[in-house]
Amino acid sequence: MRTEANSLSQKVRDLLQTPAVRRWGLYLLKAFALLAVLLVLSRFAPAMPTPVIALFWFGLSAIASLNFAYCAVIRKTLKRQKYREGGRLHRFNEGRKLWIFLGFVVSAACMAGLLLELPKWDAAEWGFVVAAVPLYLAVLLVARWRLRREYEPTFLPAGVIRWTGVITCILLCAAYAVFIALEPVSPFISAREVFDAVRLPFDESPSMLVSEAGMLVSLVDGVTMLWVSEAAVTYFLAYLIWRIVLVAATFFSITNLLGVCALQLPEIKRIFMPLERIGEDDVPRHMKASHLAWFAAFPLAFFLLFVGIDAVYSDAMKDSELTYAEQFVRDR
């Protein structure tokens, strides 16, 4: 009996040491750690002071931007084959600043929307987000198996990540459409009832800019709920499509973050290395300090800018009866 137990224990240890199990186990660990961070933010973000919420915002944005930057580097690697070394196009193609910046800006916009929506999520939305973790892995494994016959090894990971993100997002939207179609619709009687039902989680936020953004988002939510409530009764297909469009941005942000969790460290390092030529995989290359510096500089600059603008705006609104967002909402 003891021999059988030792044999089983050894088999389990051997299984855990296999590259595939270690890689995808690490993905699950990173993905669920990410969900834990999002859960904490959903509970405490409305009460976080400006520097703390800015730290989470731009930290998540920097992480999410790795996916954009990695795909951009792979495209640059392909383009490198047609440029002569020493030419202007070759030097421009070797650069990273533009794509690191654009990837960070797009990620910051996505993360801002995600942070403002997190406190409003109900159990159903959290269920979809949690289900996205194993769904993404399942789609990735199938995509990797199918695409390895289509891509060269240098370009396979980027192709797999890109297709996995698209397919996972589509599947989540399709599942959400079924959920909405089965959900009973309760139309609102009046506009006042709609706006009374709108949640204002950031109304008392210590950050004036976050509070203002939350108020404007809640206004948009109210107008959307009013239109959707009416459309659900008379134009159900339009109602269904609009609900899917609204949630698609959230699913895109989540799948993008999961894509970063699926990237291995050597793939992330390629973002900061000189571009390789096809067939030169064994040539030693090292990360460039300038690329790393730019990647760190953008989040830091945006962090300082946000904290500074928030302080100036808070001071300017200190003696005002209504802020700009409050006045805008009242006028509407």
Predicted regions and their residues:
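Alpha-helical transmembrane segments and their membrane-interface junctions
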Residues: F104-W126, Y176-V194, A301-K318
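Long, hydrophobic alpha/beta structural blocks
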Residues: W126-R192
